[in-house]
């Protein structure tokens, strides 16, 4: 209700008050003057929705980020700029007043994500860049809408604006990747360290830089698939599956639709299948040596990590076996201590499989609950493989050589708690009979290997 009032001089108010004074029943009543503050409050009008102070402050905070989007649109192309107009509509956006500055920034960066596709497109010429063109055109490539500048700008946009953690991580790694000893991001700036390096580099060094940029673009192509799927609103799994098929071809495609009722998606089945079908050697070598994964390895690693995140622990402790030759991740771990393998850990329910892999090396018995049964996915289904995630902590319960000189080791998942590997019913028939030497005399061996309950046969 809007109340209108007028201000009168004091004498008029006093006269009016006396004129209307009287009694209301037993109560004496008279008119009093309305305080000025009450009159001002009654005359106040609310601003229309969206035009209040908080809304104006929110709009002011958002303005710089809108300017960034417009700048990105001009840099990466008009088509990319047009693609962001619908997402920026006022109807779809939450009220600016309800968001913090950080939330507004993140929202604007996410709205700008489609622009990055234009930048990745402009960078495509780097896939065929020669040493001669690099030396001649670096300034052009690293300025304006040049390929190197567009690539660096697009990767920053993906790193800061993608909702997909894997895409953000991959973009960040690419920006930091060394090209000729200089981070890729710096190659997108003319006049800096990269420009100086190009001027002083030998022809052989320039050729090596060009080769490294070609390798970068292989990874960029896979990242672009993921961003395109995100912009279209497609599931993350589809982008990963498309990337695996593009990289591995029929080798990956053979797993499509093979396990429709299983717990894992097509992309996860592809990754697990490719790993067990020979890719485990290259992937684990890179993981254990701390090397950067190539594009194909990174895709498999993403798919396998997603499968492990989805899988839950087994209801009961599972006993499996592993055979290795040479040194392994647990060789230097003392009994009672915890260690882990930086790579994925393949084990089998069949001790015979472990013996065939071990030879005269090491046979390990493992007790755990977090392993994934990949026997139905692997082309080597008869190996009855149980696969543990990379970095799974294992406690060494026992490590000793038997009478034949084979190292026998017992591990349990650290999350199980101490002595879970000694549970009755799980450990049976050690059967490590003492061997004999050439003279026929019994060989000495660690007495602990005689304890029943550790099936290391």
Swiss-Prot record:
Gene3D superfamilies: 6.10.250.2690, Toxin ADP-ribosyltransferase, Chain A, domain 1 (3.90.176.10), Virulence factor YopE uncharacterised domain (1.20.120.260)
Effect the entry attributes to changing residue 383 to D: Loss of ADP-ribosyltransferase activity
Catalysis: reaction(s): L-arginyl-[protein] + NAD(+) = N(omega)-(ADP-D-ribosyl)-L-arginyl-[protein] + nicotinamide + H(+)
A GO molecular function held by the record: nucleotidyltransferase activity
InterPro entries: ADP-ribosyltransferase (IPR003540), ADP-ribosyltransferase_ARG (IPR050999), YopE-like (IPR003537), YopE_GAP_dom (IPR014773), YopE_GAP_dom_sf (IPR037168)
Enzyme Commission number(s) from the entry: 2.4.2.31
Domain TR mART core span(s) in chain numbering: 242-418
Inducing factors: By host YWHAB.
Any GO BP annotation: symbiont-mediated disruption of host focal adhesion
Active site positions: 322, 346, 385
Annotated site residue numbers, Arginine finger: 149
Cellular localisation: Secreted
A Pfam family that the UniProt record links to this protein: ADPrib_exo_Tox
A Gene Ontology term for the protein's cellular component: extracellular region
Main subcellular location of this protein, as a coarse class: secreted
Keyword list, A-Z: Glycosyltransferase, GTPase activation, Nucleotidyltransferase, Secreted, Toxin, Transferase, Virulence
Effect after changing residue 385 to D: Loss of ADP-ribosyltransferase activity
Stored PANTHER family: ADP-RIBOSYLTRANSFERASE, SECRETED EXOENZYME S
Chain's role: Bifunctional effector protein that is secreted and delivered by the type III secretion system into eukaryotic target cells. ADP-ribosylates several eukaryotic proteins including CT10 regulator of kinase (Crk) proteins. In turn, induces atypical anoikis apoptosis by transforming Crk adaptor protein into a cytotoxin. Affects host cell morphology by disrupting the actin cytoskeleton. In addition to this activity, acts via its N-terminal region as a GTPase-activating protein (GAP) for host Rho GTPases including RhoA, Rac1, Cdc42 and Ras.
Subunit structure: Interacts with chaperone protein SpcS; this interaction maintains ExoT in a secretion competent state within the cytoplasm. Interacts with host YWHAB.
Protein name: Exoenzyme T
Source organism: Pseudomonas aeruginosa (strain ATCC 15692 / DSM 22644 / CIP 104116 / JCM 14847 / LMG 12228 / 1C / PRS 101 / PAO1)
Gene behind the chain: exoT
């Amino acid at each position: 209700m809007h109340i209108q009032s007028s201000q009168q001089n004091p004498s008029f108010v006093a006269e009016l008050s006396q004129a209307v004074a009287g009694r209301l029943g037993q109560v004496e009543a008279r008119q009093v003057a309305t305080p000025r503050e009450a009159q001002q409050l009654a005359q106040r009008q609310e601003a229309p929705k969206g035009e209040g102070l908080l809304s104006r402050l929110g709009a002011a905070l958002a303005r710089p980020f809108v300017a960034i989007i417009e700048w990105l649109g001009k840099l990466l192309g008009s088509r990319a700029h047009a693609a962001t107009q619908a997402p920026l509509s006022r109807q779809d956006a939450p009220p600016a007043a309800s968001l913090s500055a950080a939330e507004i920034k993140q929202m604007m960066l996410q709205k700008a994500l489609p622009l990055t596709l234009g930048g990745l497109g402009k960078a495509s010429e780097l896939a065929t860049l020669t040493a001669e063109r690099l030396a001649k055109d670096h300034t052009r490539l690293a300025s304006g809408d040049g390929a190197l500048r567009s690539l660096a700008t697009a990767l920053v946009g993906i790193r800061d604006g993608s909702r997909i953690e894997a895409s953000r991580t991959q973009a960040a790694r690419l920006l930091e990747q060394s090209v000729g000893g200089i981070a890729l991001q710096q190659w997108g700036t003319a006049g800096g360290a990269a420009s100086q390096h190009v001027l002083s580099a030998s022809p052989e060094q320039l050729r090596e830089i060009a080769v490294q940029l070609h390798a970068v673009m292989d990874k960029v192509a896979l990242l672009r698939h993921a961003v395109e799927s995100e912009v279209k609103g497609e599931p993350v799994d589809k982008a990963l599956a498309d990337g695996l098929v593009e990289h591995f071809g029929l080798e990956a495609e053979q797993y499509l639709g093979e396990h429709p009722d299983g717990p894992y998606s097509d992309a996860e089945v592809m990754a697990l299948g490719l790993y067990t079908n020979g890719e485990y050697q290259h992937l684990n070598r890179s993981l254990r040596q701390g090397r950067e994964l190539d594009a194909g390895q990174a895709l498999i690693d993403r798919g396998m990590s997603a499968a492990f995140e989805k899988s839950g622990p087994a209801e009961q402790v599972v006993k499996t076996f592993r055979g290795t030759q040479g040194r392994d991740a647990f060789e230097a771990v003392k009994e009672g201590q915890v260690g882990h393998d930086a790579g994925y850990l393949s084990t089998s329910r069949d001790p015979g499989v472990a013996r065939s892999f071990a030879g005269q090396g090491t046979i390990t018995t493992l007790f755990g609950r977090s392993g994934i049964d990949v026997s139905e996915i692997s082309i080597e289904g008869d190996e009855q493989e149980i696969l543990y995630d990379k970095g799974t902590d294992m406690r060494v319960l026992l490590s000793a050589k038997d009478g034949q000189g084979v190292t026998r080791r017992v591990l349990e998942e650290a999350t199980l708690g101490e002595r879970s590997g000694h549970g009755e019913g799980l450990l049976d028939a050690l059967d490590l009979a003492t061997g004999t030497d050439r003279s026929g005399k019994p060989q000495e061996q660690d007495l602990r290997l005689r304890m029943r309950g550790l099936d290391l046969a």
